[in-house]
Every structure is written in C-alpha cells, then in structure tokens.
Amino acid sequence: MRAIVDTNVLVVANGLETHADAECQRECVSAITAISVNGTVVLDNLGFILDEYQEHLNFSGQPGPGDAFFKHVYDNMYSSKRVERVSITVVDDEKRAFEELPANTLDRSDRKFLAVAVVSKAPILNATDSDWDDARALISSVEVVVKQLCPQHATRGNRPLQT
C-alpha cells in the first residue's frame, strides 16, 4: 500500500480521539501497520506533513501505534521503499496555498495533504476529519481519492458519506 496518512489517523490509532470508537481505532492501527510492514507513506519535500505529525506524536515511538508509525517514518526518511517525498510548491495565494491546487476553501491545514495527493496520485487515508467529505467536489476535480477508514466519524451530522 502507498498512501498519504492524515494526522488524525495516527491520533486515533493512539486512542486519543475522543469521538472515535474502538472499531475506528482498530481500522487506523491496521492501516498504518500495513504501510509500516510493506508499504510506502508519501510526504511532502518541504516537511509540512512531518512537522504536523511532530505536533501530535512522540519521536520515541511510544506509547501508541501512531507514535510508532511516526518514528518509523522519521527513521526511514531516506529509504525510498518506505517513504516517498514529492515536491510541492508554496504560493502566496490564500485561496490556494500550493501551486498544485486550484482556489479552494479546504481547511488550510489539510491543503498540504491534498497537494501531495495531486502530485503523487496516492490516496489520502482519513479517520475522523469531516472536512474531506465537505470538500468532495474539490477532491473529485483534482482526481484525488480519500479513503475513509472510519466513515461513521467522517461526516457532519447524518449526511451520507460520499466516497
């Protein structure tokens, strides 16, 4: 598996997302374990995704599976079999943030993941961030796939999840 992992997946894997259930946590642990064992995580060359991971996870790799994944990514930064880094370009445009994206209203903190997905064509793994479902028209327009690991938590209200 080759994928971009939204930070919320790692937080849920650690059991720290209060509204995620045990099934969601298991799905997140399973996904990041599969990537760690025989997959590739895709990051940006500027370090934005890694910086966000660092804000929520521990370099020691403990105490949870999300922390272990972060340590795995950090330790394998220069192993092209485990970590792929793609180039994205920052632009001075509040409506885009990255050259790879059209004007959009996606949460600014999520735009780096989308820009990496546009360049790499890898899917984004999401657990609990409903912004991805809210932005499904944008995501479709740039031909990106968001894999919802926990569809029961990835929408606002009772609206059906669009995949």
Region locations from a protein language model:
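Acidic, PIN/NYN-like endoribonuclease modules and their adjacent C-terminal/linker elements
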Residues: N45, L114, V118-T163
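Active-site neighborhoods of divalent-metal-dependent phosphate/nucleic-acid chemistry enzymes
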Residues: K81-I124
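Glycine-rich, phosphate-binding/catalytic loops in enzymes
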Residues: A20-E23, S60, S141-V144
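PIN-domain endoribonuclease scaffold, especially VapC-family toxins
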Residues: A34-G39, G47-A97
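Short, well-structured N-terminal submotif of metal-dependent ribonuclease cores
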Residues: M1-N45
